Amino acid sequence: MDPVVIFLVLAFPIASVYLLFYHKKRVGGLSSPPGPRGLPFIGNFFQLYKAPCIHEYLWNLSKKYGSLMTLHMGSVPILVVSSPKMAKEVLKTQDLIYCSRPRMTGMRKLSYDGLDVAFSTYSEHWRHVRKLCTLELFTQKRAQLCFRLVHEQEVSRMIVRLSETAAASKDVNAFECFSNLSTSIISRVAFGKRYDEDGIGKERLQRMLSEIDAMLAGIFVSDFFPMFGWIDRLSGMRARLDRTFKEMDMFYEELIDEHLKPNRPESPTEDLIDVMLKNKGSSCLLTMDSIKAILLNVFNGGTGTSATLLVWAMTALMRNQGVMKKAQEDIRRVIGRKGNVDEDDIQNLSYLRAVVKETMRLYPTGPLLIPRETMESSIIGEDKDHMYMIKPKTLVYVSMWAIGRDPEIWKNPMEFVPERFLERPDLNYKGQQFEYIPFGAGRRICAGIHLGVTTVELALANLLYTFDWEPPAGTRFEDIDDETLNGLTLQKKNALYIRPKKYICP
């Protein structure tokens, strides 16, 4: 049974008692930012739970309450940030106060109690792991020596499979196609194997990744109402989390054991497990559990986001045929009869790169950045007449969904217009300009930006160079929607099916 339903049934009598006897006292000094009124004890829990899409719901609320908005999930205060100015305050000016992470049940369990880089609280261990990621795992040198070869080989394999599909006049499930690509790339980069070959079961891996995503995004009653934590066990959520962790731990344990075998065949390039095992001997902070936790970040962060971004890019292009045609003409003009696009070509494809940037603006893979948690009290506000007090242990969500749709920042924000990024070539995703931070900013900016963006740019360039694209038989371009689902990543509600048609270069 749904744990939230159980909780609401049990909490209703308590909320009723609060309504009879609870009286809010006026507190001197600065107040919290405004926000929708919630029920005593429960707060805004029910409102958030019943929202079809939380990012849409919070965006609409921000239009009423402003760029700083307060909600409550039980006793836990939540701050929603919806403007570049306030995002800069949180992610840069006061980053040291706002740079920790909440200890949410799903994230804590699957990250081996916060031994990773994405979900860990701010600590000496996090600083060490972050340094490992930036100086060893995701360096420019490694990108050239290892990542490039993998990218180009796996994109080429995808194009071959799609050519067979085109010859048979069949439709393609875009997410399945792009998920296969990104999972193959990440698995080769991380542990030196293609996920659907070499004995690694495709079905097992996809099932595990799906469960991990569900548990990371899942609502655990104990996170917001500790006294009702037993509901997580009664509902089966805790048992499901434990099963997911056990399966994940076994999977990563097998991979690490293979790398530790003395008779393991030598590879011309190191994968990420090789690098971490080498660094493990020189640091007491890097344990086997730390390595597994980092693999969680690399695998779940790298596979789902790249595939999702490619789906949204193709969705936007199918819905905007003029943009599709312009992108194809530009790519085919630059590449000519070469036969494929490689990484060296990407720098010369300015319109393609603008398409990817515009996709990340209108359809950010993380509509709400991974929540932060304040480590101490903070004073923040748009101006001196609107200053607010933010309490310690406040959950902080920066809404990329709201910022990317703000008409005061973007002209015609609901339209897909890559040209806006050609007019501002300085606008990038490296966390410097706070009207556009799809990968976050500050200490917590994504460490694997280059790996993810290169995957998307190279794949999309080859998709547009090699094929023309049509909707399935019996449907029109106008039938393709852009409805979204709830979740940590911005998933498309209705699967995108498209039909490739091989382009013959004149």
Swiss-Prot record:
Provide the protein name.
5-OH-xanthotoxin synthase
For the ligand (heme), the binding residues are: 446
Checking Gene3D superfamilies in the record gives: Cytochrome P450
- Lineage in the entry? Eukaryota, Viridiplantae, Streptophyta, Embryophyta, Tracheophyta
Mind listing the GO molecular function terms for this protein?
heme binding; iron ion binding; monooxygenase activity; oxidoreductase activity, acting on paired donors, with incorporation or reduction of molecular oxygen
Major subcellular site: membrane
Protein's membrane topology:
Single-pass membrane protein
Provide the disulphide bond pattern: none
The Gene Ontology biological process annotation of the record reads: coumarin biosynthetic process; response to wounding
Gene transcribed to yield this protein: CYP71AZ6
